[in-house]
Amino acid sequence: MNPLLQDYARILLEWNQTHNLSGAKHLSELEPQITDALKPLEFIKDFKSCLDIGSGAGLPAIPLALEKPEVKFILLEPRMKRAAFLNYLKSVLPLKNIEIVKKRLEEYQNPLQVDLITSRAVANSSFLIEKSQRFLNDKGYFLFYKGEQLKDEIAYKDTECFICKKRIYFYKPKESLC
């Protein structure tokens, strides 16, 4: 694993001891989550900007930002302690390419247009698409990290999905919404 990803994992485990940001207690529990965050880089189109919704403890945004330092990432996280953790990461890791915004998706009013919108374990795909599509440029994609519940979601229809173990990567172009 990339040394910067190891640093991220170490810091997350340290913060978990007092702040309970994720369920992981050991590196062996975090490594698969980091691998999961990076897996889509094998199949998604290149992108120059990304909006991550509900960034939480930084998955998938922080591993992606560390692997793609040339890409601009905006991390939306409404909860104070998680936003504080993300800001701390930005101060101690080479993450000049991220901006942390302490807001809910529904409150965010920036007119930006990004190439990719990501989310992991936040909400139903239809809801995420409806509330976030205004931030996605016309050639952009949604990338949602989903479990088996995706099969029950309406947004799943006519969507390119990639499956690895129990993870379903929902990958849908904005232009398919028309």
Curated annotation (Swiss-Prot):
GO molecular function terms attached to this record: rRNA (guanine-N7-)-methyltransferase activity
Record's keyword terms, sorted: Cytoplasm, Methyltransferase, rRNA processing, S-adenosyl-L-methionine, Transferase
Source domain of life: Bacteria
Catalytic activity field: guanosine(527) in 16S rRNA + S-adenosyl-L-methionine = N(7)-methylguanosine(527) in 16S rRNA + S-adenosyl-L-homocysteine
Family matches, as Gene3D superfamilies: Vaccinia Virus protein VP39 (3.40.50.150)
Annotated Gene Ontology cellular component terms: cytosol
Signal peptide positions (record): none
Documented EC number(s): 2.1.1.170
Localization in the cell: Cytoplasm
Main localization (coarse): cytoplasm
Function: Specifically methylates the N7 position of guanine in position 527 of 16S rRNA.
Family listed: Belongs to the methyltransferase superfamily. RNA methyltransferase RsmG family.
The protein's name: Ribosomal RNA small subunit methyltransferase G
